[in-house]
């Protein structure tokens, strides 16, 4: 199938969803956008989407695929099966790529509901950040049938630099993402703790950042997130509350396996403390603000 004859709707036009949708447009796919935020809808329409809407009723029957990039399982269920859910309007055989971070059990429940409607699910969480999403370079950790992968190949080609086929069982992709989020959350929390200690010890944070990013202690998360701290800019690309949710899923998964997670539990407590202190809607690097007596850079200073 030629790309221009392949129609896809992206539901959830946040930083990752917007990037994925724009990448689909850039790849020549006929692209639709669904979101409750009119500003996001206007932005995607200006980027070349065929149509945008708060729900996809008017164009659902035209779609070959749907990509779900909302925050969690509850939102995924709502946009698919809720009062204004799109699932019942899709034609049989439509592929649904569920990319929200959720527990394996939630992914399996959604898959069962979609199967009952004649729809085909790929359990396909994503990572890489907003910049990579916009360039079509996300990492996708996916599980599902061979048919699901084949039906969604144009979308995967458009949006991803790396696609990992974890297996056929729905829930495997979700579990890999949860383990990944353990590392992501711990890396941010550790980076924040290190920068807070540096500040307390009188080390300029721009100097500390430069040293770490050119030394063995660096990580992708440190380099990406602690730059926000150095700039004093906590405009959210991924919020503190996202990691309250994701590290909660990490701990729930470990609990179900009777498996101890010492570092992840501490990181979860740190993000929860930051959220409780009023920083939940700020960038996740704002977890550094839980440390008292620490002088942090101000934006534009």
Swiss-Prot record:
The protein's role, per its UniProt record: Catalyzes oxidation of L-threonate to 2-oxo-tetronate. Can use either NAD(+) or NADP(+) as cosubstrate, with a preference for NAD(+).
Catalytic activity, reaction form: L-threonate + NAD(+) = 2-dehydro-L-erythronate + NADH + H(+)
Keyword check for Glycoprotein: no
UniProt key word Transferase: no
Organism: Haemophilus influenzae (strain ATCC 51907 / DSM 11121 / KW20 / Rd)
GO molecular function, one term: NAD binding
Single biological process term from Gene Ontology: organic acid catabolic process
Full protein name: L-threonate dehydrogenase
EC id: 1.1.1.411
Keyword annotations: Carbohydrate metabolism, NAD, NADP, Oxidoreductase
């Amino acid at each position: 199938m030629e790309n221009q004859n392949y129609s896809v709707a992206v539901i959830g036009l946040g930083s990752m969803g917007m990037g994925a949708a724009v990448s689909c447009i850039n790849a020549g796919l006929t692209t639709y956008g669904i979101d409750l935020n009119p500003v996001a809808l206007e932005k995607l329409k200006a980027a070349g989407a065929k149509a945008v809407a708060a729900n996809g009723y008017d164009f659902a029957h035209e779609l070959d695929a749907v990509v779900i990039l909302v925050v969690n399982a509850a939102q995924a269920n709502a946009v698919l099966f809720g009062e204004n859910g799109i699932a019942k309007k899709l034609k049989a055989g439509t592929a649904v790529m569920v990319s929200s971070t959720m527990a394996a059990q939630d992914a399996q429940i959604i898959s069962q509901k979609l199967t009952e409607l004649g729809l085909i699910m790929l359990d396909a969480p994503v990572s890489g950040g907003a910049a990579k999403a916009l360039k079509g370079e996300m990492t996708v950790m996916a599980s599902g049938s061979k048919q699901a992968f084949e039906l969604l190949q144009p979308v995967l080609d458009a949006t991803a630099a790396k696609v990992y086929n974890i297996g056929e069982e729905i829930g495997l992709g979700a579990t890999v993402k949860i383990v990944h989020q353990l590392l992501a959350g711990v890396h941010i929390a550790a980076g924040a703790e290190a920068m807070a200690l540096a500040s307390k010890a009188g080390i300029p944070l721009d100097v500390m950042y430069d040293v770490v990013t050119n030394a063995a202690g660096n990580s992708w998360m440190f380099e990406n997130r602690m730059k926000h701290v150095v700039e004093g800019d906590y405009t959210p690309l991924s919020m503190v509350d996202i990691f309250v949710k994701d590290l909660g899923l990490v701990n729930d998964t470990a609990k179900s396996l009777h498996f101890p997670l010492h570092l992840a539990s501490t990181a979860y407590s740190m993000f929860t403390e930051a959220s409780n202190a009023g920083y939940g809607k700020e960038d996740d690097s704002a977890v550094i603000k839980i440390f008292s007596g620490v002088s942090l850079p101000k934006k534009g200073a």
